[in-house]
């Protein structure tokens, strides 16, 4: 499955626009991560536990979007975007979305 943040591919022509596809996941903070994060705020620097959680969440949302595009018979997703939003205190939604298309050379 090809993906791009652009609205087209240089070497392909969009044959058919299938429509919006998306994937999301909602994650909550971990009490263990919170304790470590609290300590790190004292000394400063990156909080690798949260960085890892953010990366895993983005990957899961991306994977779910790709699965939806494949189920619809798409060859690619154009206009790929990521978003985050707070859902409840201590939790966040990670969203990946774009337009599913079929391609021709």
Curated annotation (Swiss-Prot):
InterPro entries: UPF0145_dom_sf (IPR035439), UPF0145_YbjQ-like (IPR002765)
Top-level lineage group: Archaea
Gene3D superfamilies found in the cross-reference section: Hypothetical protein apc22750. Chain B
UniProt-listed Pfam families: YbjQ_1
Family stated for the protein in its record: Belongs to the UPF0145 family.
PANTHER family referenced in this protein's UniProt entry, alphabetically: UPF0145 PROTEIN SCO3412 (PTHR34068:SF2), UPF0145 PROTEIN YBJQ (PTHR34068)
Protein name per UniProt: UPF0145 protein Mevan_1624
Native source species: Methanococcus vannielii (strain ATCC 35089 / DSM 1224 / JCM 13029 / OCM 148 / SB)
């Amino acid at each position: 499955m090809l993906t791009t943040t652009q609205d087209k591919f240089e070497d392909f022509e969009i044959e058919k626009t299938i429509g919006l596809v998306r994937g999301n996941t909602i994650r909550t903070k971990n009490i263990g991560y919170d304790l470590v994060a609290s300590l790190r705020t004292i000394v400063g620097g990156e909080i690798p536990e949260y960085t890892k959680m953010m990366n895993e969440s983005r990957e899961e949302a991306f994977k779910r979007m790709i699965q939806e595009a494949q189920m619809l018979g798409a060859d690619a997703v154009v206009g790929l975007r990521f978003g985050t939003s707070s859902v409840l205190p201590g939790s966040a939604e990670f969203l990946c979305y774009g337009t599913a298309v079929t391609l021709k050379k």
